[in-house]
Structure formats: C-alpha cells, structure tokens
Amino acid sequence: MELDNNAHSVFLMHYHLVLVVKYRRKVFDDHISDRAKEIFEYISPKYNITLQEWNHDKDYVHILFKAHPNTEISKLINTYKSASSRLLKKEFPQIRQKLWKEHF
C-alpha cells in the first residue's frame, strides 16, 4: 500500500461513491457506462482525483477513487453529476425516454 503525501502530511484517502438512477430505472449498459467513465476521467484531474475502480449495473454505478485532503468532494460530485447528465442525455436520447413519461 503506497501512501500519498504533500508538504506536511501523509495520507491515503479512498472514497466509494454509488450513484443510483432516479427511480432505479434500467438505464446503464456497457456503452453508456463507458461514456460515463470517460466523463469522470476527464473531470477528475481538476480535483486531484485518481479513479481506482469502476463497476455498473443497469440502475447504478460504483466508483472507487483516491483523493487529496484538500479535495472538495461535494463540488466534484456536483460537477460530475451535472456534466454527465447533460452529456449522456445529449449523446444517448433513449435515456430521456426511460426517465420521462409522456403523460402526467
């Protein structure tokens, strides 16, 4: 186990994030999950995040990542959820049909 360090401390901070699709709808397949992972990998360096593991099922995603103590996890999650939602709905229009019904 290799520890990370900065000027005054040594640390090893792992986070396990589980993101669940609204109403547990069956949205994720391999292609959509791969694109969501690409988006996470694009955003993560800006927050000093290193992706360790990525798993998915049809209605959720498990993300294991390493972070630094000064990382604002809430801002990372907010940024990722906003960007991934916008981009995935744009690139995969079938997602909108699974999340929204035509009646009210």
What residues fall within each predicted segment?
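Basic nucleic-acid-binding interfaces
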Residues: 1-104
